[in-house]
Structure formats: C-alpha cells, structure tokens
C-alpha cells in the first residue's frame, strides 16, 4: 500500500496526498462500523430467536408464558443478552452514520476542490489516473458528489 502512495507523488502534491490518505482512512473506519453494526444486529436477532424458541418449547400452556419467564433466571439472562446486543448494534449504527457523514463531506470537498488541487493542465490529466486508482483500489468515487 505504501508503494501505491509513493506512486501518487508524480500525480499529486503532499497536501493532496494527505487528503486522499485521510479519505481512505475514513472509508475504512466507515466500513468497520458498518460491519460491527451488522454483526451485532445478527447477534440480537439470534438471541431473540433462541429466546422465543426456548420459551415455546418449555412453556406448557400459552397462558403461563409470563409466569415461566419470570420464574427462571435463564430467560432473564437471555432477555438481557438480547437487549445488550440490540443496544450495541444501535450504538454502532450511530457511529456508522457519523463516520459516513464525515467520509462523504471529505469526499465532496476533494471533488469540489479538484480544480485547486490539480491546477496545471498536465496535472489535470493526471487527476484522472488518481480518480481511477481510488475507484478501483478503494471503491471511492471521486467523479460525482452523489452517494
């Protein structure tokens, strides 16, 4: 990865290179939070499903479900585990939204300032190769501002 950034020296100056590296870091941070959110959502769904299955198997009659839940601490533990997993997924969802906003703002800033970042005509042609590399290596679209 370092050699890739060294290749950019011929196409960009140091501040532009720093902006692109910051953009890649924000993209990785956003993807990390998205993966954590998915993981915890699945964990909460599995916990809820197991809780429902255990209650349906153990409960003799539908009228006694509440009594069955309150009389065994095992069910309370599973309820707490489900609530914890859901709250953690909610926390990571908020972090994901914030990191996506930060990533999108920096991406739009680079797109809007591209005329300042590559002012000379020969550098402007090199901009295309930088944008192409960012699109194919990191899946970051610098051609358009839309998400």
Swiss-Prot record:
Coarsely, its chief localization is membrane
UniProtKB keywords: Cell membrane, Membrane, Transmembrane, Transmembrane helix
GO CC, sorted alphabetically, is:
plasma membrane
What membrane topology does this protein have? Answer: Multi-pass membrane protein
Q: Which Pfam families match?
A: DUF2663
The domain of life is Bacteria
Instruction: Report the locations given in the UniProt record.
Output: Cell membrane
Q: Which parts of the chain span the membrane according to its record?
A: 42-62, 64-84
Q: Which InterPro entries match?
A: Uncharacterised_YpbF_TM
Has UniProt tagged this entry with the keyword Hydrolase?
Answer: no
User: Is Transmembrane helix included in the keywords of this UniProt record?
Assistant: yes
Query: What is the name of the protein in this document?
Result: Uncharacterized protein YpbF
Source organism per entry reads: Bacillus subtilis (strain 168)
């Amino acid at each position: 990865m370092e050699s890739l950034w060294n290749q950019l020296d011929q196409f960009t100056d140091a501040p532009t290179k720093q902006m692109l590296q910051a953009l890649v870091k924000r993209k990785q941070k956003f993807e990390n939070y998205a993966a954590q959110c998915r993981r915890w959502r699945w964990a909460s769904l599995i916990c809820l499903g197991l809780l429902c299955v255990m209650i349906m198997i153990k409960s003799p009659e539908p009228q006694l479900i509440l009594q069955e839940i309150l009389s065994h601490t095992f069910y309370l533990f599973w309820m707490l585990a489900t609530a914890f997993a859901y709250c953690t997924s909610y926390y990571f969802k908020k972090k994901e939204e914030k990191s996506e906003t930060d990533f999108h703002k920096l991406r739009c800033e680079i797109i809007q300032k591209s005329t300042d970042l590559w002012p000379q005509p020969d550098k402007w042609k090199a901009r295309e190769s930088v944008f192409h590399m960012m699109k194919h290596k990191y899946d970051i679209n610098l051609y358009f501002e839309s998400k």
